[in-house]
Structure formats: C-alpha cells, structure tokens
Curated annotation (Swiss-Prot):
GO terms for molecular function: rRNA binding; tRNA (uracil(54)-C5)-methyltransferase activity, S-adenosyl methionine-dependent; tRNA binding. It comes from Yersinia pestis. This is tRNA/tmRNA (uracil-C(5))-methyltransferase. It holds the Pfam family tRNA_U5-meth_tr. One of its GO terms (biological process) is tRNA methylation.
Length: 367
C-alpha cells in the first residue's frame, strides 16, 4: 500500500486475516463467532494530514514511507474521502500562487463529513498576521465559490486563527434516525464514518430491550451515548476534554435528546466519586445515587482500562466494550472473565489494509 495506490483487490483477504486473528485472540475467553462489519474499500477516511514540501516554485503534499522514511509526493489519496481529494487539489493550486500563504507552511490537516462539510487547517512555522488573514479570507472565498462548504483555520506556535469557526456538523443515518454530531477541529472523531455507523447500529442492537440507565466513560462528542439514549431511561457520560464536552452538549440539544447528562471528569476521577473517595464540585446538583445503571459502556484509548476502572466496570450486569486495540482488550478480559462472559463479539474494519483492528464485545454477568 502506498499513499497514491490502494490494493483494493486484496480487501477481502486482509479482512479474513483480521477475522482469523481476532478469533484466535478470543479463543481463551469462549467468545462467540465474530460479527464482521466491512469498510468501503476506498475513500473511507474522513480525516487526513499531510506535510507540505517546498521545491523552488513547486509546492505539494507529502507523506513519509513508514519503512524507508522516504518522501512520497501525494497528488491523490484514495484512503481519504472524495471530498478531501477534491479539496487537496484545489487548495494546493490556490496556495501555490500566493507567496503569503505558502511561506513557511509545513502541514495541512483535513476533516470532512458525509454531510459535505470540510475543515482545512494550515500549520505554519511563523507568526500569522492581519495580512495573512486577509489572504486566507480570499482563499476561503475562492474555494467556496468552487462549491466547497469550507472552514479555514490557520495555526502557528500558540496561535489559532479561525476565519469563521472551528467546527463542522456531521449528519449520520443511524438505525432509521438522522443524528447530528458537531465535530471540532483538532479533537477526536471516528475516522471511518461508514464503519462508525456500523458500530453505532451494532451497539443499539446489542442493547435492545436493556433495562435501567447507561453509564459511559470516555464519551468524546457523545458519539455513542447520544445514539444509545433511545435504548435507556437515562444516560450518564464522562469526558475530560473541554472541546469534546462542549460539542457533546451541543449535540444533545441539536438532537432533541433530554435523557443524557455529561460530566467533565476522567474515568479515574469518576471511579473515586462513585466509591465515595472524593467529592467533586463538578458533581454538584447531580445525584449519582439516583441512577440505576445496569449497563456500562467503555471505549477506552489504545492503552485499555486501568486496573481500578476494570474493578469499577465489573460491578455492572452488562459491559459494552469497544476496543481499538484487541491486545489491551484481552488483558482486560483476563480480569473481566471471572465475573462476566462474552455474549456478542464484533469486528469493525475501521482501518483497512493496516494491522489495526477495532472490535466490540458485550459482556454479561455470570450467574
């Protein structure tokens, strides 16, 4: 696989290899057969970032070969959405012709949505002034005239210039409903929108008929908690990053959801609050004791759940665990298998043609 060419003909083979690998990893835990969710074979990634190479009068996107560290010129990037590919060409053509915009530009980050919106962030090794801002406004207007629904952002050391705002709104069809998700520049969003829809619909399916409330740790912009709200009486969710919490609050209102409460705290802090170890001002007005959470949802970082959080989740009858690293999932399952058994298993091909696997397990308390 190179940045310019995807081995589309090997898609099925690489997916079968991942499925076999996941089955082997789950063998010690008596997991059921995995449900397999495919990705589109190309143009599946909604985010991309490129370094910018200056070569006399020329200017172009580059990536580095992971093995050889060689520089590769990237004109088109079939991994990324078609919208990003169209903008890459138009943006670079426009910047090439404008010395003020190209000077010390070293990176461009792209974020796109299925709803047709884009953010392009231009990163510089120099201070950005009013003159830059004027040229950036002209660039934005030029690209909008070409049909791009675009937000343009300039970044330099300790500087961020937004010409309008730093977010775009995604609209995802999830099990018969359109869900609105505000996505903030430089904050985490699921990179593969088609697979994200599969994950949300699978999570809805496995929690069908659930009783009580849902607790979610690491909720981000509310991706899962808002979609799952329809299956539960109430949802209590935690998130540490301020921009994500703000986006989640917006998403709750935009989707007319009235049974989700977001708290800004880490999973570790929440564990302390639940165990009564510490009191937090942020929890004033929230009666944790009134929640009857029978299901807990976790989508942790690659490092998995820490020992204390594993102990916390073991107290719940149902654990829904989405993992972007099956190795740390297996390490957590070593502990969880003593109290819970796996009743559903899924493989989501979020990152085709790479060794990375995203998977989901539903664990239910042993009787």
């Amino acid at each position: 696989m190179t940045p310019n060419i995807l081995p589309i003909e090997s898609y099925d083979h690489q997916l079968a290899e991942k499925s076999a690998r996941l089955k082997a990893m789950m063998l010690p835990f008596q997991a059921p057969e995995p449900e397999i969710f495919r990705s589109p074979a190309d143009h599946y990634r909604m985010r991309a970032e490129f370094r910018v190479w200056h070569d006399e009068d020329d200017l172009y996107h580059i990536m580095f070969d992971q093995q050889t560290k060689q520089r590769i010129r990237v004109e088109q990037f079939p991994v990324a959405s078609r919208l990003i590919n169209r903008l890459m060409d138009a943006l670079m053509t426009a910047i090439r012709a404008e010395p003020l915009l190209r000077r010390k530009l070293f990176q461009i980050d792209y974020l796109s949505t299925l709803s047709g919106k884009l953010i392009a962030s231009l990163l510089y090794h120099r201070q950005l002034d009013e003159e830059w801002q004027q040229k950036a406004l002209e660039l934005r207007d030029q690209l909008r005239a070409q049909g791009f629904d675009l937000q343009l952002i300039g970044r330099a050391a300790k500087t961020k210039i937004m010409l309008d705002h730093d977010y775009i709104d995604e609209v995802l069809p999830v099990a018969g409903r359109e869900m609105i998700y505000r996505q903030v520049e430089n904050s985490f969003t699921q990179p593969n929108a088609a697979v994200n829809i599969h994950m949300l619909e699978w999570a809805l399916d496995v929690t069908q008929g659930a009783t009580g409330d849902l607790l979610e740790l690491y909720c981000g912009n509310g991706n899962f908690s808002l979609a799952l709200a329809r299956n539960f009486e109430r949802v209590l969710a935690t998130e540490i990053a301020k921009p994500s919490v703000a986006a989640a609050q917006y998403n709750i209102a935009a989707n007319n959801i009235d049974n989700v409460q977001i708290i800004r705290m880490s999973a570790e802090e929440f564990t302390q609050a639940m165990q009564g170890v510490r009191e937090f001002n942020r929890l004033k007005g929230i009666d944790l004791g009134s929640y009857n959470c029978e299901t807990i949802f976790v989508d942790p970082p690659r490092s998995g759940l820490d020992h204390e959080t594993v102990k916390l989740v073991q107290a719940y009858p149902r654990i829904l665990y989405i993992s972007c690293n099956p190795e740390t999932l297996c390490a957590n399952l070593e502990q969880l298998q003593h109290t819970h058994k796996i009743s559903r298993l899924a493989l989501f091909d979020q990152f085709p043609y790479t060794h990375h696997m995203e998977c989901g397990v539903l664990l239910e308390k042993r009787h």
